[in-house]
């Protein structure tokens, strides 16, 4: 037999052939035994690769037979390597003619030629299949988009969600849209850009060609998973700038997504059509540039003018520089929204009633607060800065002992730690001149605290000895901790360390909450750590705690990608929706000449109420931002006021929830009334439609007064974190306000505005 004549190379080839055959059998058996496993892209490539290895080894062995049967003689290694090269050539549609022609061996020669021919045909076929599999996804995506474009022309969908680029943010948001939208009246389209130079677009040879043809496998998987269309642009949107855009310039067509432009062009045929465009990359600069370019696209502008509600979502920090694109779009048919993930993180804290500062102080029978609120913020980046602002505003309570002649804020103290504080503090000082803060200490020194300081900034690392000293000094009375560094592992490590110290040294460890910023919770590892230590904390006082419990302990995780990028937060914009509803209820307590809804205010300050050729002033912009931020804060702070009233009732030994419900019913049904412009309430005999009883009214004057004081203190704190200071008159451009004074210095009419906010907060939701 020829294999004995070949020697060890033949036996090696035979072993490789057997291994390849076994691999094929394993793959086929898996598919047969589990029919539910789909033949996805990965499995297709594995099947092709296994088959190609099998054919290559078969060709290797066949060529060994062919060479050994010829007239020449070969060294063993020469025979092995030449056969291997000849076998590889079969996948490139090549047959070694010299070897093929010189095959001898009598009756075996036709058989060897036939085997080589069959293997060559099969190998060539696999090469074609491999090429097709690599480009099939892109071809199918294009055909799918073409068919959808034709369908959209005839039967356009009401809502369109377009994502420019595929990253973690766009994938999470698209998935949430798919899961939460019950009506099948929308389409999701991913516009993916060409591969960058680093990813091989500018490479040479076969690598460059294959990169262009195959694109990213993850791109196609993401589109398929979300039942989305995929349009791959021929050029990058970031290569354009607003200065390049001329009148009637079709940006979508210029970057090679003309089919998307056709879909947008036909959307006006559907009633209440909406088009949402998302630019959510990690680069603020690129996002702002892309949003500016898209806003000038002739197709998008035309659709907006024809009644399609058009919104551009741009991921960037919500600051004065980046808000320019929102201001420029005001008055146009296209709405531009800045999506600040750090801001949304902290808004989540406000949304969760259990995390509001009112839960970590002592509330007395009159609704005042008798204990200090002591906080620690680790990391003074975007999230840390917003957390400081949140705590300063939402921990503004009327101190026990306050009277209408002298209302004071309950003690508040916040230590902020960051190893780059010498750089970060400047912005904080500049933007919030009203906040009393100490100068930043040199690196390595502990800032000396003074009694009249509310916020103290420390310039050292959270792993330093200085931080340990600070923590040991503060842990006894610490109420609230926010850990918001850029390192998730460091964040949870610090949280566990603080919790362990609180168990050892805190006077009231049950009054401590540790908020931990976690960017990615997909693997669940940090959740396991948090649940473990929360369970240990609960079991310390509750011996019946079960091992599988996930108790609500001191450590709370927040700010992960999936919880931020949701339909509710981004598209539905829950913050603005709740603020609008709150403003409507607030306006109902004013005479008709005072009423101005959300949209009317926009039109008055920035929109159609102005001459289209005139620019809004700085005062217009600042007034709009200030009032809208107050509407949002009022909506969120309502929970604090309700909890203050409930805790006040509970302090007097009553059923807090029941008494709070009686109070809300009395306010809603007119059992408790107040004249416009006045602060005193009239307690009427409860009517038949109210559940309130006369005994409920006995302690209410002091509670309602405390709530109004608290609202004024919150209002002052919110304006201070916005950057406002006291002035003889209100000047939006100079950021001065004449109401930034103590409660007792206000006129009764101005005080009644705070009472209005309290009344709206107490009203039952219809």
Where are the regions that the model predicts?
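Charged, low-complexity interaction tracts
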Residues: 718-727
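Amphipathic alpha-helical binding modules
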Residues: 737-765
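Cytosolic regulatory regions of ion transport systems
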Residues: 1-59, 69-80, 89, 97-686, ...
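Short interaction-hotspot residues at assembly and binding interfaces
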Residues: 605, 609, 728-741
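Alpha-helical transmembrane segments of multi-pass membrane proteins
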Residues: 62-63
């Amino acid at each position: 037999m020829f294999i004995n004549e070949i020697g060890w190379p033949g036996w090696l080839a035979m072993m490789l052939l057997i291994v390849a055959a076994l691999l094929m059998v394993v793959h086929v058996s898996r598919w047969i035994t589990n029919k539910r496993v789909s033949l996805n892209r990965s499995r297709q490539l594995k099947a092709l690769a296994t088959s190609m290895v099998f054919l290559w080894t078969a060709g290797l062995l066949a060529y060994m037979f062919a060479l050994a049967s010829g007239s020449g003689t070969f060294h063993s290694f020469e025979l092995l390597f030449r056969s291997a090269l000849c076998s590889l050539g079969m996948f490139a549609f090549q047959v070694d003619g010299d070897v093929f022609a010189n095959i001898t061996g009598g009756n075996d020669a036709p058989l060897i030629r036939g085997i080589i021919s069959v293997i060559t045909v099969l190998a060539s076929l696999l090469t074609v299949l491999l090429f097709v599999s690599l480009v099939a996804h892109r071809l199918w995506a294009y055909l799918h988009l073409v068919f959808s474009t034709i369908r959209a022309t005839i039967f356009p969908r009401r809502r369109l969600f377009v994502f420019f680029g595929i990253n973690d943010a766009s994938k999470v948001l698209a998935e949430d849209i798919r899961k939460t939208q019950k009506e099948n009246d929308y389409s999701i389209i991913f516009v993916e850009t060409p591969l960058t130079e680093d990813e091989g677009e500018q490479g040479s040879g076969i690598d460059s060609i294959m990169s262009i043809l195959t694109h990213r496998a993850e791109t196609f998987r993401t589109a398929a998973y979300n039942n989305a269309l995929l349009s791959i642009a021929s050029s990058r949107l970031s290569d354009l700038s607003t200065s390049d855009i001329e009148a009637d310039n079709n940006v979508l067509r210029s970057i090679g997504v003309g089919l998307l432009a056709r879909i947008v062009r036909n959307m006006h045929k559907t009633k209440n059509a909406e088009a949402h465009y998302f630019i959510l990359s990690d680069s603020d600069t690129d996002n702002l540039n892309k949003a500016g370019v898209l806003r000038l696209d002739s197709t998008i502008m035309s659709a907006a003018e024809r009644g399609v509600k058009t919104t551009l979502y741009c991921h960037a920090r919500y600051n004065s520089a980046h808000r320019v694109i929102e201001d420029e779009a005001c008055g146009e048919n296209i709405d531009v929204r800045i999506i600040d993930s750090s801001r949304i993180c902290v808004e989540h804290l406000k949304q969760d009633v259990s995390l509001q500062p009112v839960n970590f102080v002592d509330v007395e029978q009159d609704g005042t607060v008798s204990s200090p609120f002591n906080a620690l913020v680790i990391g003074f980046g975007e999230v840390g800065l917003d957390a400081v602002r949140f705590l300063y505003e939402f921990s503004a309570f009327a101190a026990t002992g306050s009277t209408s002649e002298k209302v004071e804020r309950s003690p508040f103290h916040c230590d902020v730690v960051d190893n780059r504080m010498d750089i970060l503090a400047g912005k904080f000082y500049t933007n919030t001149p009203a906040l009393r803060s100490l100068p930043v200490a040199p690196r390595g020194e502990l800032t000396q605290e003074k009694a009249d300081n509310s916020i103290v900034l420390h310039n050292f690392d959270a792993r330093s000895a200085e931080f340990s000293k600070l923590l040991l000094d503060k842990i006894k009375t610490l109420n609230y901790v926010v850990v918001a560094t850029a390192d998730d592992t460091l964040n949870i490590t610090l949280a566990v360390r603080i919790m362990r110290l609180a168990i050892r040294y805190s006077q009231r460890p049950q009054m401590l909450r540790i908020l931990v910023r976690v960017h990615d919770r997909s693997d669940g590892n940090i959740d396991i750590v948090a649940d473990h230590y929360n369970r240990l904390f609960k079991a310390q006082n509750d011996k019946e705690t079960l091992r599988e419990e996930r108790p609500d302990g001191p450590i709370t995780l927040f700010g992960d990608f999936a919880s931020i990028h949701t339909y509710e937060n981004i598209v539905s914009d829950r913050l603005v929706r709740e603020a609008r509803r709150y403003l409507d209820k607030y306006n109902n307590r004013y005479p008709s000449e005072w009423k101005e809804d959300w949209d009317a205010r926009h039109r008055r300050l920035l929109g159609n109420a102005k001459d289209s050729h005139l620019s809004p002033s700085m005062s217009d912009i600042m007034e709009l931002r200030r009032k809208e931020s107050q509407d949002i804060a009022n909506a969120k702070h309502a929970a604090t006021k309700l909890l203050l009233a409930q805790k006040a009732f509970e302090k007097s030994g009553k059923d807090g929830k029941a008494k709070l419900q009686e109070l809300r019913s009395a306010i809603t049904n007119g059992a408790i009334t107040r004249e416009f412009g006045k602060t005193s309430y009239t307690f009427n005999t409860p009517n038949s439609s109210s559940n309130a009883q006369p005994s409920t009214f006995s302690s209410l004057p002091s509670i309602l007064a405390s709530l109004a004081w608290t609202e004024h203190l919150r209002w002052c704190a919110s304006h201070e974190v916005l950057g406002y200071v006291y002035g003889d008159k209100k000047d939006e451009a100079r950021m001065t306000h004449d109401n930034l004074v103590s409660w007792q210095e206000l006129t009764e009419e101005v005080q009644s505005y705070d009472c209005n906010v309290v009344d709206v907060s107490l009203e039952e939701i219809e």
